[in-house]
């Protein structure tokens, strides 16, 4: 029996539309603020408020789904995101956009947890990997489409918000024709996240998720600003962002295969080294396209490999808590990355974006080069 049932396909269609809207706004919001002459640190704070919303959404998602179920919670989250998007049209100022992007971040995190949980509940032990792989591919595909749209349509605020809002409302429609059952509140014991964060065998994996959050949060939030300050148009910025995310899509399968065959520790070391190499290449004004490509290949695949490392020693009943801990770690990194990096960029130079990325990657590489107390050659379970 195929893993891709009718409800699953409809859910993924809704996710695709929702992700396109996220990608468009994540690129244009920093550019719109920059066009209004807001300082770089304020642009970074608005990006961080979005990731703060992600953290809050992650924490409340379980109870939200428990109370409303998958379908109703999905629809409510879409409505919240649409309202937060339309609110951007009211006024362009730091404090109001800080609030709107915070609400948008909550809605996005809710959608991610809802979709992931619905897919896991729909699948079996033999096809959950296929479902989550499809989820990741749809997410990145939607991100690329969103970036490419910036080269086709007008990027003016009052032109973009109406059709993005309509796209989010359209993303609600597929789940009107699909029903997902949800877990009752008495079906499983409460999840304890804190012991997972303190687990010694998972430390390098958790650190990897934090580093991945710093890296991707900074790239998503501040790379458009970096490129804009280089004199690029909004359409060109969208094209470069599409290249970055496309390289992440291309890198998913080979990195996963390498981790299975050669061990996750070796692959993590290679990934982090390539992140440093790509950052140095951009700082050295070498060819932008190949440098950004290898940076995306390594950076966008770091999180799943680190997550797999951390989950290796977790028992079946600990996986949910461990995954929640890893998502929280990633979100905290995504929150800290744009905040610290934007302040450094404002005070010194835009080049601090890639100096920061290379610096945190180097620190993690030093951790990985030490003898791990996890296991000598960590392989995925077959």
UniProtKB/Swiss-Prot annotation:
Its subcellular locations are: Cell inner membrane
Please provide an example of a Pfam family that matches this protein in its UniProt record: MFS_1
Its keywords, alphabetically, are: Cell inner membrane, Cell membrane, Membrane, Transmembrane, Transmembrane helix, Transport
- The record's principal subcellular location, in a coarse class, is membrane
List the Gene3D superfamilies hit by this protein, alphabetically. MFS general substrate transporter like domains
Bilayer topology: Multi-pass membrane protein
Q: List the disulfide bonds.
A: none
PROSITE patterns according to UniProt: MFS
Q: What GO molecular functions are on record for this protein? A: transmembrane transporter activity
HAMAP family assigned to the protein according to its UniProt record, in alphabetical order: MFS_YcaD
Q: Return the similarity comment.
A: Belongs to the major facilitator superfamily. YcaD (TC 2.A.1.26) family.
Name by which UniProt lists this protein? Uncharacterized MFS-type transporter YPO1380/y2792.1/YP_1213
Which organism does this record belong to? Yersinia pestis
